[in-house]
């Protein structure tokens, strides 16, 4: 018997991500037939109202088995329970409700508690779960969502509190980007292809980049973003995780423990980011005045110095990467919308084609459409001896038309069900990643964000100078 208990079940993330992922896993029969899902939150909702929250963002698609009939059956397994996050009696009640359908012996039951909650609630809720809803002899797992902390100090406190009651084996810390199929495949691209590994180093690579650009702003999220900013929102977690998979040494195996060890080793090779290696920006209203600036949004202070853009350089002491520019850029309110990693190889000096003036580039696009592209050169057909640039690419949907490419949350929840940590982050990764950015989290004074108009190509003008100083180009 599998019981999945979703805390924060009336919230936006649970509605848009958690429940659709659970339904997809149900349709694909990854969730066993004998299961129940319990939603828990402070909101006092009827079961009918709670069911509407569950189904609000689940699309019906008969071609993949996600029929209305399947959804109706799925909802029959769902029960909503209102309660507090700080009273033992609420958790005793929850435990009784879970147990009503657990007719098998404890050794044959699994409970997964998924905390889709603000981080300040992780410790008290996890402690009450352990003391009031954790039967002896039963497999019980805890999933916690990002963000884990606001800086190194707060993250360390949260992790320490969690570890008092839950073992690392039973705790699953989500960075859902690790469930993205393209990101999950980075290690295969690197280590399963013999042509890449020999040249994946400072002798042959000019730069490593991760670019995250959004053509929309913070509408509807102003209050959240005021407490986060772009670095906390996506850089310290999602983008750094992607970058780490590009730069690690080869793990001994595909086991989570071996991969995590190599990730931590690389993260520890990185210097803390200095003020000289980062540019912050904040978007103002669009040039035509139709889109409001960040400071004009609900929940945002009139004099806010929260960043909606940043470009930064990481510096590694790892022999493979020492001296190579490692760049992360992320921004909202730009003129394009995509997320990709880019490896630029050094130009070949001399040779029989000295006029070739552009580098080979490997592009790994995560969205909007997953693809792998290698930019190179060939001779133009015909009598000409001219060398022209070409792009060789693999588009995932076209290359795998009959394959269900799972969404990120489906992957991470499936891992938790199976007790695998492959697509989760470790305590060491969380602590080390915060240390890298702690010195540049305060976006006031010298690090005050520079203005750029909504719809800008490159964020603040200082970005262009930032790239020029590093012999790179913004594109």
Swiss-Prot record:
Localization: Cytoplasm
Catalytic reaction annotation: D-glucose 6-phosphate + NADP(+) = 6-phospho-D-glucono-1,5-lactone + NADPH + H(+)
Sequence positions that bind NADP(+) 1: 42, 146
Ligand binding (D-glucose 6-phosphate): 146, 214, 233, 332
SUPFAM superfamilies (alphabetical): Glyceraldehyde-3-phosphate dehydrogenase-like, C-terminal domain, NAD(P)-binding Rossmann-fold domains
Active site: 238
Protein name: Glucose-6-phosphate 1-dehydrogenase gcd1
Gene it is expressed from: gcd1
